[in-house]
Amino acid sequence: ALQAGSRVPAMLNFSPGPAAIDAARRAAELKLVITSRQFVEKGRLQPLIGALAPSCTILYLEDVRSEIGPLAKLLALLGGIAPLAMSRLRFGRQGSADDEAVVLFTSGSEGLPKGVSLSHAAIESNRQQISSVIDFSREDVVLNALPLFHAFGLTAGCLLPLYSGVRQMLYPSPLHYRIVPEIAYDVNATILFGTDTFLAGYARMAHPYDFYSVRYIFAGAEAVKAETRRLYAEKFGLRILEGYGTTETAPARSINTPMANRPGSVGRALPGIETRLEKVAGIEEGGKLLVRGSNVMRGYYRAEAPGVLEPPVDGWYDTGDIVTLDDGFITISGRAKRFAKVGGEMVSLAAIETLAGEFWPHHATAAAAGPHERKGEEIGLVTERPDADLAEFQ
């Protein structure tokens, strides 16, 4: 509806707090915030609304409902019957595929959140890329509990089935580990999207028959643990197909498929996506991954330069990930910024965390690097396991 009126939706993640939200507002020059009084009350988001109110108009859906009269309802009915004709009649301008379709925001893990501008062409290209390697059909039912303010939940979990004519069921929270499997059973879901954390939670709580109708489970956003794969294979007889992407690529850029699946990798690059590896000093195997394709973003918006689009250089998006390639399969070693140089050797902090997760699967762990007089840097491991012993790694 917003796009039909030449408005660009910007999907705000409400969880980071007022400072991050205000940075996102400034970056994309947001003027209007659409929300719900009930949502604000249940989420206890009054401080966030208070921070936005001086610079944005706050529009509550409950107030809009009371203003919808018979004429508006008639126009909505006609719009459902002939959407293109009504759109041109009401708004005149016919949009371009290269127009901005949506603005999403990065997590801000490396500074203030950045706005990511995606075009209609980028989203449609990614849909076609995924559909060319995965057999979606109108007989499928997609269950998506991922938040729509993230690219995985919005473009992969919502827009992909919507534009493909595939039925879908949206659920507002991925954290309801008992409820989501029950919904999968009730709606006869055939396709499920999730992260390793959420999928592991569903598997622990689900009855073995809850996922009886599921054909494919797609995972992204974080590495899938071997324990999660084992649990789904033994309890449900299902494989998890792991993919890889970011907001900047709308989001998918590689995926394992039923016919080409290598656990531990994130699959092969999708059709139409160019890849190249840049060598990184100290890392002998693999390199930093850059990608280019029609699904790549229009550019960034930054809070430091509100409304100024910063396109990727020559169309190449620098992922910042160190990867290796084997027969086209991409394996992620870690973020370029998350390597430590110990005694002249580059060591992946992510690899250490993965190893710790295999030894202590039920306890959170994190690795960090700090200066060392002789070795240059040393690595520290923080864990919630009370009786942790590094001797277990030897």
Please tell me what each predicted stretch does.
Residues 4-77, 90, 188, 195, ...:
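Structural core segment of the AMP-binding/adenylate-forming
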Residues 2, 33, 100, 106-109, ...:
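Conserved S/T- and glycine-rich ATP-binding loop of Class I adenylate-forming
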Residues 3, 124-141, 149-191, 204-205:
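Conserved AMP-binding/adenylation subdomain of ANL enzymes
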Residues 1, 5, 13, 136, ...:
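Conserved AMP-binding
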Residues 268-272, 281-313, 345-347:
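Conserved ATP/PPi-binding loop(s) of AMP-dependent carboxylate-activating enzymes
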Residues 33, 192, 287, 293, ...:
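AMP-binding/adenylate-forming catalytic core of the ANL superfamily
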Residues 61, 73-81, 166, 189-194, ...:
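Gly/Ser/Thr-rich phosphate-binding loop
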Residues 58-105, 112, 132-141:
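Conserved pre-ATP/AMP-binding loop-to-beta segment of ANL
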